[in-house]
Amino acid sequence: MIPISTALSDGLIWSKTPHNRGYELRCNGKIVGSLQRKSCWSSEFRAESADGSWKFRRTGWFHTGTEIADSTSGARIAVYKPNWSGAGTLVFPDGLTFRITYKGFWRPVWTVLTDGGQPILSIRSHGRTVEISKELHLSHLSEERVTLLAMFTWHIMQQTAEDAASAAVAVAVTS
């Protein structure tokens, strides 16, 4: 896997992996990171990159929140709390807070913002492209953090789509 810093100028694209329920973040055919579901019955995902590996697992009474943990030690790295619209807040123990928002219905664009509203990255659901903000000064954000944000945002996009599909099935069955 290549580091995300080597891929910033060339563009990043998410693609589905063949024969399993996973995705790869690629730049010019080279893998930057991967996201795999633990099993078809599990809501836990494993994300891997040159900068680290993490577990994303649902938390809370109705499993609406998500916890990010280090896949080796199991230590909690961050907690995501969604709001009523599907967007939410990602909080790290060091105090850094990010807002994950989306705009659009048919082809939404998901954006990660600093707590002050500065855009960090955007992911277009239709083209599956990741755009890192040109104004972002990576000096205050580690490469690992930027990689984790790109991978976690894709995970939240997939989780939101699955939740919507489940709700549609529930409505169809009860109607």
Residue spans for each PLM region:
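Intrinsically disordered, low-complexity proline/glycine-rich segments
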Residues: 1-175
